[in-house]
Design a protein with these regions (language model features):
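Active-site rim elements
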Residues: 77-81, 250-258, 304-314
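Histidine-centered active-site loop/cap adjacent to the catalytic His
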Residues: 304-346
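A short helix->loop->beta-strand "cap" motif at the edges of active sites that frequently abuts
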Residues: 99, 199-204
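Short, solvent-exposed beta-strand-terminating loops
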Residues: 49-63, 157-159, 210-234
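Substrate-gating cap/lid alpha-helix
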Residues: 217-288, 314
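Conserved SGNH/GDSL esterase-like catalytic core that processes O-acyl groups on lipids
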Residues: 62-188
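N-terminal secretory targeting modules
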Residues: 1-101, 144, 331-346
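Structural recognition of the beta-strand scaffold that forms the well-ordered cores
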Residues: 45-57, 101-106, 146-151, 156-158, ...
Length: 346
């Protein structure tokens, strides 16, 4: 499912201020030298590519889950339209600095995939767009975003799914193979973004977030499981997790944590490799690996959704947003988004 770009509602009021970096563009718009769409293109564009970790989703009945998967845009830690006060998304934080255009590309159940691999029936029903499709969406857009945030790969660490019996006994080689497959597929599509960025006449910053801290996360999950043991009305869909993500079963968690750690090392090395190939030769591209999500403390039950005890609660979304934003300063500085973009006090 594709999403429409979100434009800061008060952008015209803000760019009309004489101190705005976009005031000259606003005057051109007032003189009808450029259109409203052309004015919007001058604003910083921020995109989020990712999976369910980036989305406001939880599992319940099949029909409700299907409906939610198709309506959950703009209800997460990247972008929350009409957000309640207790929810502070990345887009909302950046809006305090500058009016912007936010583009949410993440997909429920999304995988780091091979471009020509066939999706399973469940993901086709949900309208899932895997990493290759999300990248293709950005490349087809009229304008490549200035800041591209990527947090994907969590669905690729379900190592027990379709696992041969022998690999349950000795899983190390399987974990190595899965982490390497993810790296190769990730690298292929990231290179497509970098190739496009190299042709741009302006700066582009890309942040690759490592997978979340599963060791900490499972402490929160265990706390939720203990609460459900004492009160079965809590987390009513908690056991459904195992139907969709086999490796969340307690028996398989240790190796899931191992695999996620291996993936993060691969992603870090991949970024260093691509920096040598692209960034060191092209001054207007910045590519960074961030461990902000990989080190965030997710070890509390209240960070999990009260229905499935799997996806993030409102408080969980805030923790993820705060972690992700905490490591954006180098990218914002590279793009020139900072004090000069802050609205003047009234």
């Amino acid at each position: 499912m594709k999403s429409a770009p979100f434009v800061s509602p008060n952008f015209l009021e803000r760019v009309a201020e004489p101190g705005s970096p976009f005031h000259r563009d606003y005057l051109a718009y007032q003189r009808r030298e450029i259109t409203r769409a052309e004015l919007i293109r001058q604003l910083p564009h921020v995109a989020m590519l990712g999976d369910s970790v980036c989305m406001g989703i939880h599992i319940s009945s099949p029909w409700s889950t299907f409906w939610r998967a198709h309506t959950c845009r703009g209800k997460n830690w990247f972008l929350h339209r009409d957000a309640p006060r207790e929810t502070c998304s990345i887009a909302k934080t950046l809006e305090s600095i500058t009016p912007l255009v936010a583009i949410e590309c993440a997909g429920v159940g999304a995988l780091v995939d091979h471009e020509y691999s066939r999706q399973d029936l469940f993901r086709r029903i949900l309208g899932t767009r895997n990493f290759s499709a999300q990248v293709s969406d950005l490349l087809r857009a009229f304008r490549l975003p200035d800041l591209i945030l990527i947090a994907i790969g969590h669905n690729n660490v379900d190592w027990a799914w379709r696992c041969p019996p022998n690999d349950f006994v000795e899983p190390h080689e399987r974990l190595k193979r899965l982490s390497e497959d993810l790296r190769q597929n990730y690298r292929r599509d990231l290179r497509r973004l970098l190739e496009r960025a190299r042709t741009q006449q302006r700066r582009v910053a890309i942040v690759i977030y490592g997978l979340i801290n599963f060791g900490s996360y499972f402490k929160g999950r265990e706390a939720a499981e203990h609460l459900r043991e004492s009160d079965t009305t809590l987390y009513p869909r908690l056991e459904m997790t195992y139907k969709y993500f086999i490796s969340f079963h307690p028996t398989y968690r240790r190796n899931l944590i191992r695999l996620a750690s291996m993936v993060n090392k691969k992603l870090h090395a991949m970024v260093e490799e691509l920096n040598r190939e692209f960034v060191h030769q092209t001054e207007h591209i910045q590519l960074r690996y961030s461990d902000a999500l990989a080190t965030a403390d997710l070890g509390r039950a209240e960070l999990l959704h009260p229905i499935d005890g799997w996806h993030a609660s409102v408080e969980g979304h805030n923790v993820l947003a705060n972690a992700a934003v905490s490591d954006l300063a180098p990218s914002l500085e590279f793009l020139g988004i900072g004090d000069s973009h802050r609205p003047k006090p009234r």
